[in-house]
């Protein structure tokens, strides 16, 4: 196993490394969005190199990171991250609304997203929601809940990633594929529960620790009553 403890540079962001590796052969380490949020993991590259990633805590890999370079063979190990697409909801037009309208719309949007158990990050007057179901289903949820007046679009996750802090990226992309993918399309008035936004956080574990067969409980507060969920 080849131990990787430092990132040498980034071929997409660093012009020095871009020039240095312009004629190099890339041996890709392909990671999904959850793997990319781990500072420690073990995985093989496309050419079969057994790589042990052991970075400082809170350091995460980015698309294009250079992990190793053999100058003699001109082969570089480079990270390729496959991220989910993201629904981007533009809230800018709400600035022209009255305070009451703004608060009401934001509250109802939070209810609609939370009712789907969709993760979300709000930044730059936009809401970023990683896709966990087909775009047609997410489009249906937005329109059924009456948010067609809010512009929204679907973009590549790689386009959003540079706008996020590490913690925001971990929330948005870390384990989004494990989110419940059920979809409720009823009007908010028809939903008897869920008056608040639920964002199910990320469980981050070191190597060798997993959620296997054990259960754990967590609670949500809904207005004036509480209830527990068992996983």
Swiss-Prot record:
A GO biological process held by the record: protein folding
Main localization, broad class: cytoplasm
Function: Involved in urease metallocenter assembly. Binds nickel. Probably functions as a nickel donor during metallocenter assembly.
Taxonomic placement: Bacteria, Pseudomonadati, Pseudomonadota, Gammaproteobacteria, Enterobacterales
InterPro entries documented for this protein: UreE, UreE_N, UreE_N_sf
Annotated source species: Yersinia pestis
SMART domains (alphabetical): UreE_N
Domain of life assignment: Bacteria
SUPFAM superfamilies, sorted: Urease metallochaperone UreE, N-terminal domain (SSF69287)
GO molecular function, one term: unfolded protein binding
NCBIfam families: PRK13262.1
Subcellular location: Cytoplasm
Renumbered residue ranges of the record's region Disordered: 185-231
Keywords: Chaperone, Cytoplasm, Nickel, Nickel insertion
Family classification: Belongs to the UreE family.
Keyword Transmembrane included in the entry's annotation: no
Protein name: Urease accessory protein UreE
Biased composition (Basic and acidic residues): 203-231
GO cellular component term, pick one: cytoplasm
């Amino acid at each position: 196993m080849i131990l990787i403890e430092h990132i040498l540079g980034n071929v997409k962001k660093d012009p020095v490394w871009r020039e240095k590796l312009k004629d190099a052969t890339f041996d890709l380490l392909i990671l999904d969005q959850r793997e990319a949020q781990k500072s420690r993991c073990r995985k093989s590259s496309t050419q079969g190199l057994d790589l042990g990633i052991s970075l400082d805590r809170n350091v995460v890999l980015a698309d294009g990171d250079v992990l190793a370079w053999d100058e003699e063979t001109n082969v570089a190990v480079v990270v390729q991250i496959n991220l989910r697409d993201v629904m981007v909801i533009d809230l800018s037009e709400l600035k022209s609304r009255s305070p009451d309208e703004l608060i009401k719309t934001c509250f109802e949007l939070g209810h609609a997203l939370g009712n789907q158990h969709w993760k979300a990050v709000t930044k730059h007057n936009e809401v970023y929601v990683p896709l966990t179901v087909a775009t047609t289903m997410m489009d249906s949820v937005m329109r059924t809940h009456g948010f067609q007046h809010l512009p929204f679009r679907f973009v590549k996750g790689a386009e959003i990633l540079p706008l996020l802090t590490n913690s925001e990226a971990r929330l948005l992309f870390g384990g989004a594929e494990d989110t419940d993918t059920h979809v409720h399309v009823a009007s908010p008035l028809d939903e008897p529960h869920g008056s608040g936004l639920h964002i199910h956080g990320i469980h981050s574990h070191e190597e060798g620790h997993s959620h296997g067969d054990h259960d754990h409980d967590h609670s949500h507060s809904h207005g004036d009553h509480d209830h527990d969920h068992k996983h």
